[in-house]
């Protein structure tokens, strides 16, 4: 253990301000061991806790109330004498860099200390100290997701920070439950990690005969399954084994702010190792398998914390999406019904279509986020919000329940993610099911359009929004071989100013104007400053008077809407002149903020975490990935058109041969007809064959091994393996000629033959046109289509504003409303349109 950790209390004293504060912290600890506790809601205390048998007792600490219900079901098996249960309902603090007051104010941390009987002044290195505890074990029960891993990680960090000696006594344990189960008849096989399940599938020939069930969380298990887990505690209780300095280093590396640089280097090495295993076709390493009885702290943080936190927190450069967002987009593209759907129902569809194995609550939040369009959220929302999806009043937190709002794929989304590209993406496979791609490839870098925020382990990312029109111009410059122009952050409908301070910093200003000697009007706030927060934290604070000084403001009135900001602020007499002499109004009223571009971290196309220095650098790397996809798209489309032309030509030949009685269909077996077709050199269905070839290519590239028997045989032919399987693969399928023999009698005519020949020639003409096009031409066409759709949306918005202005104008003319009430109710943009309209009529 490092010197820093040995002297933990010294460092805490320095942060807290002295031994007095340390004494205050110790006041939160129990004075003596007691068998009965009061005042801790939802605690199911073990009957023997705090008694002479306390060392045999285990406290089950659960992640939330649903997990507590599962644990209580298990108590019917193990009994209540030696087991207690307590649900932890909030996120535990990272105690590495907190001061004493922050730790002392955590009610749930204090509850854990009281339940266990811990004291900050004891190290629990001796048997006498250990016997003062109310429980001899702490058993953590959390979900199999990134939140569950974080919950466990923060708990381990907490105990390691204050009582590292407890790990030497195997005090902390992990209760694991199956993440998946395979059932066939009475046989059940449980899996505690997805890599373990994948390995079983590879080694089990008849795995398809099993029924597979995934457990999205602890709440998914039934009471019967919970009791079964508790009946085999040896299998399900995993010790956190202390392994010396390596474990100390791993914990500090994961949580200490002083280890940021070292943590970054360490995590980079771990990711390199993981990617190398993937490239070599090796199975993914996992923490839990059927042989696991203990894990070291180092292994836990390497496998559970490092990859999951970063993967789910930081988006990919190519599509700007995190895994959950990508699954939502995949499901929206795949759904046959493109009409609006309830968010809760869409979350269920996403879980089914994309093999999502965690709780649907987070999916609903992801869907809501993708549809939000208030100022400071998205420049282009990929989903249409139909209902209350949140506003700038509370930064989206005021969205309605997912059961009562609807979402729909935005029309502009498909112009950003063209359907033709779906054929050249690298899709992932799970349970022999094709799910979302490793990344989509939009026509402009969406990570810059909508920005990104996220905090992982060792990295955090914060990318501002940029103007999609300017990004289109930069892409066209790159296509033309010209240098990019520097970009400044831009947010849709933001009426303030964004001014560059230096290459990596921009000042963001709200809008404030003086109405008279004692009144100002605030009509815009800095980006990410929400209206409700501003009122509570800034304006209400300025209304408070300080020593011998009058308050800055005496009153304010609110006239904002869900989309606009409007505070009319009354200042104390003479305050305006005083402020103007000393400070800028933007500074006094906190109407300025800084936008940094120094923390732009993303996964690149190869899955590596990288730091980017500018939006132009991101655009350049995106450009390289996108260019490759256009080349692949052209190749794919040429293959499709050529196969379709060949198919039409074969059908025309077939009709002609039938008309000329060279092929007789009446009273003949299908096998005999197919034999004749083969002798006459008719092709097996060219389109079907081409699609099968593309499918096999995709499956091989994805590493998916669970193909149909015929597909495996086809692969064997190409790779020279297993001659018996290869022989089966080349055996002609009768169905390959259905496109000929299945033609309706009415189509066996001269007119139909001529029609097919014409269609074939048209396909070949399309081939010739496409062959002449370059990847640059394809890209520019997509960009122009996108800009056309974007312009249509803007015109529709203007039309909506004009209609609103017209309604107000009519109401004023009819004297149903007054000018002053209109000014208080409508947005500045609508008022401007109304003023123009009124001027044109005067």
From Swiss-Prot:
Cite the entry's keywords alphabetically.
Answer: Cell cycle, Cell division, DNA-binding, Mitosis
SUPFAM superfamilies attached here? Type II DNA topoisomerase
Name the Gene Ontology molecular function terms of this record: ATP binding; DNA binding; DNA topoisomerase type II (double strand cut, ATP-hydrolyzing) activity
Report the GO terms under cellular component.
nucleus
Question: In terms of domain of life, where is this protein from?
Answer: Eukaryota
Q: Name the residue ranges with Basic and acidic residues bias.
A: 1-26
**Gene3D superfamilies for this protein:** 3.30.1360.40, 3.30.1490.30, 3.40.50.670, Topoisomerase II, domain 5, Topoisomerase, domain 3
Please cite one Gene Ontology biological process associated with this protein. Answer: sister chromatid segregation
* Variant or mutagenesis effect after changing residue 304 to G: In av59; no effect on viability observed at 15, 24 and 25 degrees Celsius
Region Disordered, as annotated, extends over 1-50
Query: Pfam families from the xrefs?
Result: DNA_topoisoIV (PF00521), TOPRIM_C (PF16898)
Q: Does the keyword Cell cycle apply?
A: yes
Q: Phenotype on deletion? A: RNAi-mediated knockdown leads to impaired removal of the cohesin component scc-1 from kinetochores on mitotic metaphase chromosomes.
Q: Which InterPro entries match?
A: DNA_Topoisomerase_II, Topo_IIA, Topo_IIA-like_dom_sf, Topo_IIA_A/C_ab, Topo_IIA_A_a_sf, Topo_IIA_B_C, Topo_IIA_dom_A, TopoII_euk
The chain positions of domain Topo IIA-type catalytic read: 314-783
Asked if Cell division is a keyword of the record, the answer is yes
Say which family it is in: Belongs to the type II topoisomerase family.
Q: What does this protein do?
A: Plays a role in the removal of cohesin from kinetochores on mitotic chromosomes and is required for centromere resolution.
According to UniProt, the name of this protein is DNA topoisomerase-like protein cin-4
Organism of this sequence = Caenorhabditis elegans
């Amino acid at each position: 253990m490092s010197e820093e950790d040995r002297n933990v209390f010294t460092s805490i004293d320095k942060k807290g301000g002295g031994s007095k504060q340390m004494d205050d912290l110790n006041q939160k600890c129990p004075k003596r061991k007691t068998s009965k506790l009061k005042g801790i809601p939802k605690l199911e205390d073990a009957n023997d806790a705090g008694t002479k048998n306390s060392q045999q007792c285990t406290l089950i600490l659960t992640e939330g109330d649903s997990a507590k219900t599962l644990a209580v079901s298990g108590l019917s098996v193990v009994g209540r004498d030696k087991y207690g249960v307590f649900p932890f309902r909030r996120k535990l603090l990272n105690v590495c860099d907190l001061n004493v007051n922050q730790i002392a104010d955590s009610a749930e941390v204090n509850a854990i200390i009281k339940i266990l009987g811990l004291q900050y002044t004891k190290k629990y290195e001796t048997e006498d100290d250990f016997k003062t505890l109310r429980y001899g074990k702490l058993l953590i029960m959390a979900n199999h997701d990134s939140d569950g891993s974080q919950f466990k990680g923060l708990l381990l960090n907490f105990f390691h920070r204050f009582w590292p000696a407890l790990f030497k006594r195997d005090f902390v344990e992990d209760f694991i439950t199956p993440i998946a189960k395979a059932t066939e008849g009475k046989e059940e096989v449980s899996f505690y990690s997805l890599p373990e399940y994948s390995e079983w599938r590879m080694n089990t020939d008849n795995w398809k005969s099993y029924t597979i069930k995934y457990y999205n969380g602890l709440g998914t298990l039934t009471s019967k399954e919970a009791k079964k887990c508790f009946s085999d505690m040896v299998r399900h209780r995993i010790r956190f084994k202390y392994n010396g300095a390596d474990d100390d280093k791993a914990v500090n590396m994961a949580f200490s702010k002083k280890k940021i640089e070292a943590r970054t280097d360490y995590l980079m090495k771990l990711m390199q190792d993981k990617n190398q295993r993937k490239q070599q076709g090796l199975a993914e390493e996992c923490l839990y398998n059927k042989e696991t009885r203990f894990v070291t702290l180092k292994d836990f943080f390497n496998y559970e914390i490092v990859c999951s936190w970063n993967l789910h927190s930081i988006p990919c450069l190519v599509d700007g999406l995190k895994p959950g967002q990508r699954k939502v987009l995949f499901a929206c593209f795949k759904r046959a019904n493109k009409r609006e759907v309830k968010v809760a129902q869409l979350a269920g569809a996403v879980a089914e279509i994309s093999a999502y194995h965690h709780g649907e609550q987070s999916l609903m939040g992801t869907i809501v986020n993708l549809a939000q369009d208030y100022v400071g959220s998205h420049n282009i929302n990929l989903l249409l919000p139909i209902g209350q999806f949140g506003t700038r009043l509370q930064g989206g937190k005021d969205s309605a329940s997912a059961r009562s709002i609807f979402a729909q794929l935005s029309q502009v989304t498909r112009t950003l993610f063209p359907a033709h590209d779906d054929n050249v993406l690298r899709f992932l496979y799970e349970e022999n099911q094709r799910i979302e791609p490793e990344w989509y490839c939009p026509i402009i870098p969406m990570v810059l359009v909508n920005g990104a925020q996220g905090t992982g382990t060792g990295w955090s990312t914060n990318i501002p929004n940029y103007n999609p029109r300017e990004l289109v111009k930069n892409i066209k410059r790159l296509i033309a071989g010209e240098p990019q122009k520097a970009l400044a952050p831009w947010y849709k409908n933001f009426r303030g100013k964004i001014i560059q301070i230096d290459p990596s910093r921009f000042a963001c200003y709200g809008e404030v104007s003086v109405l008279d000697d004692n009144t100002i009007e605030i009509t815009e706030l800095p980006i990410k400053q929400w209206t409700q927060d501003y009122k509570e934290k800034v304006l209400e604070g300025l209304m408070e008077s300080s020593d011998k000084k009058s308050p800055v403001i005496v009153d304010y009135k609110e006239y904002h809407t869900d989309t606009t900001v409007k505070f009319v602020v009354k200042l104390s007499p003479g305050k305006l002149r005083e402020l103007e002499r000393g400070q800028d109004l933007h500074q006094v009223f906190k109407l300025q903020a800084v936008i940094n571009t120094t923390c732009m971290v993303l996964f690149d196309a190869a899955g590596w975490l990288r730091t980017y220095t500018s939006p132009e650098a991101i655009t350049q790397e995106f450009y390289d990935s996108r260019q490759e996809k256009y080349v692949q798209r052209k190749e794919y489309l040429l293959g499709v058109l050529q196969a379709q032309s060949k198919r039409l030509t074969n059908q025309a030949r077939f009709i002609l041969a039938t008309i000329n009685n060279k092929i007789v269909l009446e009273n003949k077996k299908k096998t005999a007809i197919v034999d004749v077709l083969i002798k006459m050199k008719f092709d097996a269905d060219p389109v079907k064959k081409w699609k099968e070839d593309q499918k096999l290519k995709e499956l091989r590239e994805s590493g998916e091994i669970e193909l149909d028997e015929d597909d495996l045989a086809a692969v064997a032919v190409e790779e020279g393996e297993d001659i018996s399987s290869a022989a089966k693969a080349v055996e002609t399928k009768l169905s390959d000629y259905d496109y000929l023999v299945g033609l309706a009698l009415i189509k066996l005519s001269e007119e139909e033959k001529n029609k097919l020949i014409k269609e074939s020639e048209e396909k070949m003409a399309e081939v010739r046109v496409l062959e002449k096009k370059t990847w640059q031409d394809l890209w520019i066409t997509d960009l122009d289509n996108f800009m056309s759709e974007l312009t249509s949306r803007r015109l529709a918005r203007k039309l909506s504003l004009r209609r609103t202005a017209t309604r107000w104008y009519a109401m004023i003319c009819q004297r149903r409303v007054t000018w002053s009430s209109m000014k208080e109710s409508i947005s500045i943009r609508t008022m401007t349109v109304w003023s123009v309209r009124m001027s044109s009529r005067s």
